[in-house]
Amino acid sequence: MSKLKEKREKAVVGIERASKEEAIELARVQIEKAFGKGSLIKMGESPVGQGIKSMSSGSIVLDEALGIGGYPRGRIIEIFGPESSGKTTLTLQAIAEVQKEGGIAAFIDAEHALDPVYAKALGVNVAELWLSQPDTGEQALEIAEHLIRSGGVDLIVVDSVAALTPKLEIDGEMGDSQIGLQARLMSKALRKITGILSKSNTCIMFINQIRMRIGVMFGNPETTTGGNALKFYSSLRLEVRKIEQVTRSGSSDDVIGNKIRVKIVKNKVAPPFRKVELIIYFGKGISREAGILDAAIKHNLIQKTGSWYSLGDNKLGQGRESVIEYLSKEVELANNLDKRLRKIIFNNFDQENDNFIEFKEDESE
């Protein structure tokens, strides 16, 4: 009797489910008539359910920390930090990577301060980069909206939120009080952008600055400009800070770059709060080779014994700087290491059964 009862209960559940699916299908037809085809679909039928596409940051250690192999497409990203901490360099490096893959990028220069010579040194094809230098914050955000709606742009960078000045403020007198204008502008614009962004493969990055809150006695007095809307709508928030200067080997005065720390304070596509350290060389950008070396040590492709670094039975060099310099000269080896690391990190690659890397002897020895 218990088996018969169980069968009857299953049959009733099946009938109920079938009737529910019929009801949902009727509702779906009505919704599509009112709002268009695709207004209501199962997640398995949608690109949303197929995983998030990404674009490389230009650094393998940052790509790993981001959790999906780079910056997510179809999302809003905020990169913030103190002045001269490497924020613009991160975005220009991302533009260079997008262009290498045949993508299209746009730079909305609200600060009117983009240096094409520096951008070119970082690998940006400045001849193919779309540039806008808007007069007002409204103009900048409307241009961004049009670019997203076009569906032809892979990456948009807005530099910076602090420079998105509302038209009312520009037209007003210097001493006029314009409380909350920029915050309201950002809130309205992001509400519009978020909806259309999710239907595209466009990634939009906002560079933001840090301000000090007056009268804060306890806790962190730092905040970002433009109100709270950007914090809310961003899928990814990166805090960038300079931690020390990088000097040439054997000299304490010859500064050749900065070491920065990138902390992922918000991540809606992977686990947050990861930290990575990157080296930015003046006039060259993020050191790809330093990132490859750090990742290779972490994943046991390169072994460190004392001050010596080795790949299998072959010694690469003594001292971190010398190995980074060696990898910068041995481009093929660096590329092979990068490819193998990406397989290990992002595809659960079995490193024991792969002979991908071919070691090239240093002819100078």
UniProtKB/Swiss-Prot annotation:
CDD domains: RecA (cd00983). ATP binds at residues 81-88. The gene is recA. Disulfide bonds: none annotated. The keyword ATP-binding applies. It comes from the Bacteria. Keywords: ATP-binding, Cytoplasm, DNA damage, DNA recombination, DNA repair, DNA-binding, Nucleotide-binding, SOS response. One of its GO terms (biological process) is SOS response. InterPro entries: AAA+_ATPase, DNA_recomb/repair_RecA, DNA_recomb/repair_RecA_CS, P-loop_NTPase, RecA-like_C, RecA-like_N, RecA_ATP-bd, RecA_C_sf. One of its GO terms (molecular function) is damaged DNA binding. Can catalyze the hydrolysis of ATP in the presence of single-stranded DNA, the ATP-dependent uptake of single-stranded DNA by duplex DNA, and the ATP-dependent hybridization of homologous single-stranded DNAs. It interacts with LexA causing its activation and leading to its autocatalytic cleavage. It comes from Borreliella burgdorferi (strain ATCC 35210 / DSM 4680 / CIP 102532 / B31). The keyword ATP-binding applies. Coiled coil: none annotated. GO terms for cellular component: cytosol. Gene3D superfamilies: P-loop containing nucleotide triphosphate hydrolases. Its main location: cytoplasm. PROSITE patterns: RECA_1, RECA_2, RECA_3. Pfam families: RecA, RecA_C. It is found in: Cytoplasm. Belongs to the RecA family. This is Protein RecA.
